[in-house]
Structures are given as C-alpha cells and as structure tokens.
C-alpha cells in the first residue's frame, strides 16, 4: 500500500521481528530487491545486526537515542569507532580483553601481543579481537598470548575454538579457524591479525587508532595519536 503512493521515503520499523528465521531471510532479500528496483530511500529500523549488514547501503548505530557511528556496513564492521559498535556487529560477537599499552607494546595479561609505532600514552585499555582475527601460532617466539582450550567445534568449513583467558571480559571467547586444522593441545598460543583487532579507551570506550590499523578514509577521520 505504501509503494502505490510512490513516496519519497519509506520508514520500516522492525517489519520482520515476528517472522520465523527462514521467512525473515526470504523477506529481507525481497525488501532489498524492491528498494533497489524502486530507488525509494528507505529507513529500516532493526535490532538484528545481520539484517542491518545484509540490507543496508549505510548503517547508523544508535545507543540510548544517540548516534554512535554511521557508515557503509563493511566500514563500520572493519573499523568500529566505539566499543559498543564493535560488540553490536559480528556473529559470533567480538572478543573483548582487559589489556594495557606500555612503551608501544600491547599486552593481554603479561604477554605482549602487538607493538605499534604510534605514540600512545601508557594506559589500561580494552583490546577487542574478531573471532576470525586470531591464528594458532606454533612458535613460542614473537607476539601472542596463551589460552586454555575449553571446546573444539567443527562446523562445516569452520572450526570454532572456544577458549578461556583470565583477561577476557566473558567466561570464554571464540576463535574461528579453518576446519582442516587439527587442534589436540589443551593450551595454545594465539597471534593477532593486524587488521582484526581494535583498541578502546578504558574509560570512554572510544577507539584508539594506530597507524597499523587506522580509520578508513570514508570515516573522514585521521589516525589518532593519543598522547593524553
């Protein structure tokens, strides 16, 4: 009925919330097709991050009525500006650790996991790591941190490593690996992929940008050197 009137804009307020999973997937594909066909600007309100990522050309992430970040879905996923945004987007959710930076080295517990050339004041911080942002490191040399294996789950092409670490803000965290990997040890060393982890201020939870993992150009922000 709304489309018959040929409006300049459509507002859809959680239209799929009462549908079952299969129908919801089909309907969001149809909504996307109709929007592209008609060219009508559409505001789609949802609490489902998968809907937001799959349907939208641009995402606005809100918290308590305040805008946290706006941008293309992949830009927001790849470079969250706030810890809330990082935790909202992604399934499985991003892993968050209590950490610190000292003399440019980033620590989880007592182990250095990365070193940045960006001048950042020594401070406690949150280190958020995407599940796909870690690899099992065989060598004991170099950066990385050790974790205790809780479960190994093979799901088709992916292997989910469920592990524990005292610095993690939850009881366990997940690491997504290729299913052709064989994990038999009870404790492993994990190394970080440079573009799959993010640093956040411990008080404000705002992103601390480093040159090894800067803000995308589309955000219109320059690399932040946090000298206090």
Regions found by a protein language model. Name each.
Residues 26, 79, 87-88, 137, ...:
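Residues that scaffold the ATP/ADP-binding catalytic core of kinase and kinase-like folds
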Residues 105-228:
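Non-catalytic connector elements of ABC transporters
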Residues 39-42, 84, 93, 171, ...:
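Secondary-structure boundary/capping signal
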Residues 20-22, 50, 67, 73-74, ...:
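Generic secondary-structure boundary/loop-capping signal
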Residues 1-84:
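ABC ATPase nucleotide-binding domains
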Residues 78-101, 128:
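C-terminal boundary and immediately downstream tail of ABC-type ATPase nucleotide-binding domains
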């Amino acid at each position: 009925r709304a489309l018959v009137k040929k409006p300049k804009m459509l507002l859809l307020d959680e239209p799929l919330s009462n549908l079952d999973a299969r129908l919801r997937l089909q309907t969001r594909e149809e909504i996307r097709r109709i929007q592209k066909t008609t060219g009508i600007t559409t505001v789609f309100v949802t609490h489902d991050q998968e809907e937001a990522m799959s349907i939208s050309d641009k995402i606005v992430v809100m918290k308590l009525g305040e805008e946290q970040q706006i941008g293309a879905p992949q830009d927001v996923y790849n470079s969250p500006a706030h810890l809330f945004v990082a935790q909202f987007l992604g399934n499985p959710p991003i892993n968050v650790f209590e950490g610190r930076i000292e003399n440019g080295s980033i620590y989880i517990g007592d182990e250095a996991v990365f070193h940045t050339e960006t001048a950042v004041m020594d401070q406690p911080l949150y280190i958020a790591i995407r599940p796909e942002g870690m690899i099992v490191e065989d060598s004991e040399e170099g950066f990385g941190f050790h974790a205790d294996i809780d479960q190994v789950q093979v799901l088709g092409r992916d292997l989910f490593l469920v592990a524990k670490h005292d610095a993690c803000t939850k009881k366990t965290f997940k690491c997504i690996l290729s299913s052709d990997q064989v994990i038999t040890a009870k404790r492993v060393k994990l190394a970080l992929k440079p573009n799959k982890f993010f640093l956040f201020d411990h008080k404000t939870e705002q992103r601390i940008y480093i040159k090894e993992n800067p803000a995308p150009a589309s955000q219109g922000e320059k690399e932040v050197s946090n000298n206090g």
